[in-house]
């Protein structure tokens, strides 16, 4: 029951550095940086935890991935919806090309490391390579035996979102019915509550000898749509109701406060992480609270959006690489320094974190960033018009 990730929100994901000097959204950079650090804290369970001093931050660190999902829904949703709102033709080719260059190079590089040096992995067993290559591992995994690189589950959710959302958006744009969109969203939320409740009650009664919470509730895409939906709802508001978005933006700090209160409620609902209460109604509550934080972060006048936090932009830029590689580095550091770091919470976190940051920087500058430059050259060569004018922050998920 110890899995989470961040993923990448790969579009929620870690940001992608660009060479543009357009205005960034420092509030979203800050949220992304918080999400990745929170995830690193949570995954310290792999190396024995970081002690009582960090337990308060470690316990709910799995929520970092949900923050990435909301960010992804908002930023990618905005990219897809903007041309549709203007009545323009949406380029599926350009969209999927951007996604492929954004996600695959760093992902393939880390997958290769796991396959070539399995002794360094954070867990002894690993699912077959093809489940990762086809982004299938989140719906077919033996977590008890094959937990290595299992944090790729959130990338699978993201990829499924990339494949399906543009089609849904195009369909609803042609339907031109706001009521249908609202009904679909309500059905998705209520259906998710019902499905997770049914799965939980079924397996709680059977009590199978496996980690059914992770395998059947936490990982599968159909149970993890709340965060993406909350982010897309923000994108719909911004794209189709810009005046309302601006009006609400004047109250961004109130939204931030309500969002933090909502987070406190989510902590209470998930006080038993694998319990029925959290896994039935907890996900929509958590996603709504995180959406309020993202909304506040997207406003230039909010407390978290008005100025950049030193280091947050860079950490946001490398967060995808950091997410991908940190568990592998945890395993490597534990192999060589585990005994010396045991029980030394602050020093242990700094050691594991700094080593992971160094590895992430290498992955980012050697693989991820050159791939993004190549993507831009390919798009220019093919004379593919950008999907939508975006800030540098939005392109960080482009």
Where are these regions (language model features)?
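Alpha-helical transmembrane segments in multi-pass integral membrane proteins
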Residues: 3-27, 34-37, 41-62, 77-94, ...
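Central hydrophobic cores of alpha-helical transmembrane segments in multi-pass inner-membrane proteins
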Residues: 69-79
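Alpha-helical transmembrane segments of multi-pass membrane proteins
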Residues: 93, 97-110
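Hydrophobic alpha-helical transmembrane segments that constitute the membrane-spanning cores
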Residues: 109-117
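Extracytosolic (periplasmic/ER-lumenal) interhelical loops and adjacent juxtamembrane/interface segments
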Residues: 129-144
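Central hydrophobic cores of alpha-helical transmembrane segments
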Residues: 131, 183-190, 260-261
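Function-critical hydrophobic alpha-helical transmembrane segments in multi-pass membrane proteins
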Residues: 145-167, 228
């Amino acid at each position: 029951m110890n899995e989470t990730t961040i993923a990448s929100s790969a579009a929620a994901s870690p940001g992608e550095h660009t060479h543009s000097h357009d205005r960034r959204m420092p509030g979203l950079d800050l949220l992304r940086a918080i999400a990745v650090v929170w995830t690193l804290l949570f995954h310290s369970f792999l190396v024995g935890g970081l002690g009582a001093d960090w337990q308060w931050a470690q316990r709910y660190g799995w929520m970092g991935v949900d923050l990435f999902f909301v960010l992804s829904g908002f930023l990618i949703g905005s990219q897809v919806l903007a041309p549709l709102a203007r009545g323009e033709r949406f380029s599926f080719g350009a969209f999927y090309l951007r996604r492929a260059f954004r996600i695959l190079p760093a992902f393939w590089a880390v997958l290769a490391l796991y396959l070539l040096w399995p002794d360094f992995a954070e867990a002894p067993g690993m699912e077959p390579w093809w489940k990762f290559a086809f982004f299938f591992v989140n719906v077919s995994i033996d977590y008890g035996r094959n937990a290595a690189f299992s944090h790729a589950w959130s990338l699978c959710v993201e990829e499924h979102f990339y494949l399906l959302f543009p089609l849904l958006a195009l369909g609803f744009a042609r339907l031109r019915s706001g009521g249908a969109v609202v009904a679909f969203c309500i059905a998705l939320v209520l259906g998710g509550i019902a499905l997770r409740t049914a799965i939980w009650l079924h397996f709680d009664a059977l009590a199978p000898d496996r980690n059914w919470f992770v395998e059947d509730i936490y990982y599968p895409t159909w149970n993890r749509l709340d965060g993406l939906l909350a982010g897309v709802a923000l994108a719909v508001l911004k794209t189709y109701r810009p005046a309302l978005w601006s009006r609400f933006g004047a109250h961004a700090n109130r939204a931030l406060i309500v969002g933090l209160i909502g987070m406190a409620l989510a902590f209470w609902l998930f006080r038993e992480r694998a319990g029925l209460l959290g896994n039935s109604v907890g996900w929509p509550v958590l996603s709504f609270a995180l959406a309020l934080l993202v909304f506040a972060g997207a406003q230039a006048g909010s407390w978290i959006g008005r100025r950049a936090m030193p280091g947050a932009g860079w950490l946001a830029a490398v967060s995808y690489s950091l997410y991908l590689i940190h568990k592998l580095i945890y395993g490597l550091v534990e192999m060589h320094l585990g005994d010396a770091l045991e029980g030394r919470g602050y020093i242990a976190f700094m050691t594991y974190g700094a080593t992971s940051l160094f590895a992430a920087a290498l992955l980012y500058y050697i693989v991820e960033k050159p791939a993004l430059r190549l993507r831009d050259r390919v798009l220019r060569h093919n004379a593919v018009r950008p999907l939508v004018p975006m800030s540098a922050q939005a392109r960080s998920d482009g």
